[in-house]
Amino acid sequence: MTIQDKNTTTGELSYFETTLLLYLKESHPHIADAKALVRARADEAAGSYERAIRDGLSVTQALELADAVLYQDLRFSRFDTVFEVVSEWFPEVRPEKRADFCLKVLSPAETVFSKYPIDDRFESSPACHTLTVELTGFIQSYIEQYGV
């Protein structure tokens, strides 16, 4: 497996840039256009991969190390959490409007998210359930105040 770590002369994205960009578009759309972040993380991940291969690790192990660098502090997605809450509890937000609504409510919902120590392991913590309950109430109030 060849992993391209630099942009080609044709302007194509590297494997790590493409992988991260697709993930950001799906789970962190509010930062998907952060080109400097994508470039820096892709470069770091490629470097990690290359060092791991030089150190004799398998391709699978090297990719695991590179992924740890690529997705650091991005594993928990505020957008995905809002989207799941809206999908489960708010049928008045039609499926075709759901992503746009979630993007709209994401910034105001930061008042809820900021109360929690969110990191890559947060989703498996007991506090995640509490956040989800609080977020549901916040979104209900938001809809009552501003509508869908």
Task: Give the positions of each predicted feature.
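C-terminal alpha-helical interaction appendages
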Residues: 2-148
